[in-house]
UniProtKB/Swiss-Prot annotation:
Part of the ribosomal stalk of the 50S ribosomal subunit. The N-terminus interacts with L11 and the large rRNA to form the base of the stalk. The C-terminus forms an elongated spine to which L12 dimers bind in a sequential fashion forming a multimeric L10(L12)X complex. Gene3D superfamilies: 3.30.70.1730. Pfam families: Ribosomal_L10. Belongs to the universal ribosomal protein uL10 family. CDD domains: Ribosomal_L10 (cd05797). This is Large ribosomal subunit protein uL10. It comes from Streptococcus pneumoniae (strain 70585). Keywords: Ribonucleoprotein, Ribosomal protein, RNA-binding, rRNA-binding. The gene is rplJ. GO terms for biological process: translation. NCBIfam families: PRK00099.1-1.
């Protein structure tokens, strides 16, 4: 192999390792058997949630995982592999890929990493069942508003009872 090709591959390993280090979550899938139309729809959905989706050779993924400190992730790089990286939303790639796999049986989640820790297929699927960031924030807001609303209702009830008494 020429030195130019080796240098390009080494650069690609560095780029992928950088993406792995920076990613909040990584999901590895086997996308073999997806039609072009399904793949296009999947990529569009992922792009809409700011998730980067790439098909990369396993040898490059293994080396990048080792360089990123995710040595245990190398075991899922068997057979055709596509990788989804998300720097912001931890749940988005798992949720989108899991939802998509329900309609496209050819898509199979293999495993991944969550905030720098290797995750099994089961852990990724469990992550996919959680609500996304906006859903979690709305739940938090509801929990925070409930006591304030209850106090407001109690004050209103006291005021109404005093008006009735007067």
């Amino acid at each position: 192999m020429s030195e130019a090709i080796i240098a390009k591959k080494a650069e690609l390993v560095d780029v992928v390792a950088g993406k792995m280090k920076a990613a909040a979550s990584i999901v590895v899938v086997d996308a073999r058997g997806l039609t072009v139309e399904q793949d296009t729809v999947l990529r569009r959905e992922l792009r809409g949630s700011e998730v980067e989706y790439k098909v990369i050779k396993n040898s490059i993924l293994r080396r990048a995982a080792e360089k990123a400190g995710l040595e245990d992730l190398a075991s899922v790089f068997v057979g055709p592999s596509a990788v989804a990286f998300s720097n912001e939303d931890v749940i988005a790639p798992a949720k989108i890929l899991n939802d998509f796999s329900k309609n496209a049986e050819a898509l199979e989640i293999k495993g991944g990493a969550i905030e720098g820790a290797v995750a099994s297929k089961e852990e990724i699927l469990a992550l996919a069942t959680l609500p996304n960031r906006e859903g979690l924030l709305s739940m938090l807001l509801s929990v925070l508003q409930a006591p304030v609303r209850n106090v407001a209702l109690a004050v209103k009830a006291v005021a109404e009872s005093k008006e009735d008494a007067a």
